[in-house]
Amino acid sequence: MIERHHPVVERIRVPLRNLGSAFEGFRVVQISDLHVEPNLNPALLRKAVDMINGLQPDLIAITGDFITHNAKVVADLTAPLADLKSRAGVFASLGNHDVWNAPRRITEALGHHGIRVLTNSGTDLTQGHDQLWIAGIDSAWAGDIDLPSALKGRAKGGPCLLLGHEPDYADEVAQRSSNLLQLAGHTHGGQICLPGGQPLMLPTLGKKYARGLFQVGGISLYVNRGLGTIGPKARFACSPEITEITLSNTSAA
């Protein structure tokens, strides 16, 4: 179906407490679930890279499932990602398919393309006197999550951007943290949906939060519909997605 060849840009605004003025209006562009083999058309990935660069993002986040099964091809098939441009860098977390196959190979290949994979780790992004913690966790389905390690070093009460592939893990994150935006994928938004977007099938750890923006306790969660497909090479009522997220201070939201 031709829908899978035409990504759309979704734009949202997410407030975070204690977000410094230097990060007011900070724009994060997210993609997810590339599944570069066997189903992703290379032309679609190049098109997505061009669309992302056209948005001139401050930061790019990629939330896992770079492959489906064959990690040996990941370096070549993800080569267009080396052309991604953002002011603060490109960060990623791994998905369940990445972890089931060859997480080290994928992490190294992405690093070669200038993409920093965060697995149970984080880093402090500083602009002037203001800080934003960027963190990533392992796959909740296939890996071994260590959320405290991912958040270690974060300023108390400070704003945080967390890359975590499976959206339903947000319930656990919300019990252990707050003032945080989790970016997830995994569900493909359902991939094949009824008119209006009702998913016909959703994966483990993706059944509760299928697509879009949610408030989960004291955190926000955004679930991206992904770029690629798994199983049938088709999408219906569920276009591939590039998300532009603008951060704002709670008091300015």
Positions of predicted regions on the chain:
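N-terminal membrane-anchoring alpha-helices
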Residues: 1-22, 253
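Conserved beta-sheet core of the metallophosphoesterase superfamily
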Residues: 112, 167-246
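Binuclear metal-dependent hydrolase catalytic cores centered on His/Asp/Glu-rich metal-binding motifs
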Residues: 108-115, 119-121, 127-172, 235-236
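Membrane-embedded segments
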Residues: 5, 20-118
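Active-site metal-binding loops of divalent metal-dependent hydrolases
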Residues: 32-36, 64-66, 96-97, 121-122, ...
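Short, conserved loop/helix-junction motifs that constitute active-site signature segments
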Residues: 55, 81-87, 152-156, 174-177
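Short acidic-hydrophobic surface loop/beta-edge motif
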Residues: 10-16, 121-128, 212-216
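Active-site-proximal beta-strand elements of phosphoester/diester hydrolases
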Residues: 25-35, 131-139, 161-165, 220-225
